[in-house]
Amino acid sequence: YSEKNKASPNVCIIGGGIGVAPVACFASTLLPNSYDFYASFKSGSYGTKYLRANKLIITTDDGSEGIHGMLPAAINAETIQRAGYKYVYACGPTPMLAYVQKICKEANVKCFISMENRMACGVGACLGCTIRTTEGNKRVCKDGPIFDSDIIIFDEPSGVRRQSLAAEMQPDLSVEIAGVKFNNPVIAASGTFGFGQNYRGLFDVNKLGGICSKGMTLEPRAGNPGQRLVEVTGGLVNSIGLENPGVQHFIDNELPEMLKLKTTSIANLAGSDLESYVKGAELLDKTDVPMIELNISCPNVKAGGMAFGLECTAASTVVSAVRKVTKKPLVVKLSPNAPDVVGVAMACVKAGADGLSLVNTVQAIAIDIENAKPVFANIRAGYCGPAIKPLALRMVYDVVEAMNRLPKEERVPVIGIGGIQNWQDAVEFIMAGANAIEVGTATFSNPNTMIEIIDGLAAFMKRKGYATLEQMRGVAQVNCTQ
């Protein structure tokens, strides 16, 4: 910004959202009443009273301040020409900047925009913040952030702006998975929630869509010896080792209490060999549990567990064997450690799985550097938490993408698991194609996480006009075959 513009009475400054603050700072260097200021917010006016503008025009999405609407409700090319502006300076969301560029071009007025782009290094080395211009790629951190709008190339808008649901309408969060009804898609993940009783003093567990039991094996297990947990960057490494009282004890004691809850119960069944899986399934088949989650993916046990989920033949064998002895809806829990997760998923579907849940924890190791040895007695353990979310999301996306290539009658529902911390994460998994989600590690740091996800999901669906989960499910699948 040159000095000769400092006292110009023909300056228009436009800010949107958090972009108001930078241009407000710029405005403070100009003479009072030498500029007009347009501020666009979702709600409120956020300190604009301190501006010394000739005219202050505010727009708000909710109508709480100024003009009800977005920036186009207050300014267009005709407005710029009529006001006699010679220079326009803008900072805000990319769609707003694209609009400002457009109207300034129509009005034949010089425009400078402050671009924002995600960056890593901030010194021009990583090239993560480059934007497209008529002069080639430019780095926002070093070549900007201020650019002549004439050279900026904005991407064409993607997607459709959706209308919110009517005020009296509430979105339907219910979902049906393999014939089993869930009041909402948020399920407590196996291994993190006990049998549904431990958290009852912290929040109303009946509000959950479902609860998945601890991993049950045919025989009782004491779990792994020694240290079982290590907190690491982005999550936890755990080596619990499927400690559980055994399937029969579960049927006699824990399951009746689970079934009293006003939420859908799922029995997670693990095993050490094919026979134990089959016998465990036979026992569960005689109960009232609505669904079985077949765990072929536990990474921190020496016998069975993940060994059945790493390749197609082994996975198909155990699913087929269990399928023969139970009529219960069978959801197979997959491992992220399989070299070909999609291949294993399709093999499970072909073998009789009614659904898939993915992913379990990522196999990891922690080292005790003081004693120069592995932290865990079992050496390898399971890494869980927010750091694995992008990996889990990719695998869910890939599996759903492959599922969509099957005839409709052969497709099965998918439950997304892995690093889900908030409702935004849940939306990502559902848009990737998941029918429901399971939440685990996040509950340790915030017991109310799942309730917050349910509430946030409902609010998002209402705001974006999704009346049902099915309307939102899979919308991010770009190669979807209907």
What are the residue ranges of the model-derived segments?
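Glycine-rich phosphate-binding active-site loops on the catalytic face of alpha/beta enzymes
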Residues: P93, S213-L218, I296-C298, G355-I365, ...
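C-terminal helical cap(s) of enzyme catalytic domains, especially alpha/beta-barrels
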Residues: I146-D155, G223-T233, I367-R380, T443-A467
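Glycine/Thr-rich beta-alpha phosphate-binding loop at enzyme active sites
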Residues: D61-S64, L236-V237, N244, C298-A314, ...
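N-terminal capping/small domains of soluble enzymes
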Residues: M169-S265, A270-S272
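FNR/FR-type flavoprotein reductase catalytic core
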Residues: Y1-M115
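Alpha/beta catalytic cores of nucleotide-metabolism and tRNA/nucleoside-modifying enzymes
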Residues: C141, Q163-Q170, C384-R411, Q421-Q482
